[in-house]
Structures are given as structure tokens and as C-alpha cells.
Amino acid sequence: MVIIQNNIHDLSVNEDDLSCILQKVVKEWGKGESELLVRLVDEAEIQNLNKVYRYKDEPTNVLSFPTDLPIEIDEKILGDVVICIQIVLKESIEQHKSFNNHLMHMAVHGTLHLLGYDHIDTKDAQNMANLERKILAKIGINNPY
């Protein structure tokens, strides 16, 4: 199950589409039926989260927080993906992309982090980017890079 928490009440976000797509990502590339929370926030909130958890005092587009439940608790909760709508909008304008396509890309990117993918080294970054392209192509979004 994917839960969308739209903290900024942005009506331009199609929450049903976002939820449906991420549910498919989790099911196909992840751990079957798992719970994922997607939070849509403003710059101040994501900057605070970035400062507290990554020691970077600046806003960013997306952050992922894996669940911290003990392994003994058999809940299928992946964690949270936090997306800053304002940053995604700015980036989409700067990069000449559709806002919705860029939002989907950031949501997929954050979800893949929760599924164990990363981009710390070049090989992992290429693998993650290739998987993002594959997922986005399935929903009609061209190469985001």
C-alpha cells in the first residue's frame, strides 16, 4: 500500500497516479506487498530534514528514510519518501521537463533507495539510472537524464 501525505495541499499532484505507479514499483522490483509513505512537503520542511539527517543545511528534491522497525516486528513497511514539490517544480522548469514527469522520476528514485538501490559509486549509479529509465518508460516517460 502506498499512502500519499500531501502536507502542502498541492492540487496539481495526481495522488492516485503517484500511488498506483509506486505500488507497481514496490511489487515488481521490491518486496511484494509493502507499505510506503510518500510525503509531499515544502522547502522549509525538507531543508530541516536534510540538515538533521544528512547534515546538509539546504533544501533538496527528495529524501528517503527506510523503516527503523526491529527485524523481529514482521511488518512490511519500506519507509518514507519525502518530496519537496517546490524544488521539483523549480528543477522541472530549469531542465525543461514536465512537472508531473519530474515528480514521478523523483518518487521512483526515492522508492528505489528504499528497495536497496543507490548511486554512491559509478556502477551503482548506472544500474539505478538504468532501472529508473526502464520503470519510467513503462509509464510513458522519456529518459529523465
Curated annotation (Swiss-Prot):
Zn(2+) binds at H109, H113, H119. One of its GO terms (cellular component) is cytoplasm. Its EC number is 3.1.-.-. GO terms for molecular function: metalloendopeptidase activity; RNA endonuclease activity; zinc ion binding. The keyword rRNA processing applies. Binds 1 zinc ion. GO terms for biological process: rRNA processing. Single strand-specific metallo-endoribonuclease involved in late-stage 70S ribosome quality control and in maturation of the 3' terminus of the 16S rRNA. NCBIfam families: rRNA maturation RNase YbeY. Belongs to the endoribonuclease YbeY family. This is Endoribonuclease YbeY. It comes from Vesicomyosocius okutanii subsp. Calyptogena okutanii (strain HA).
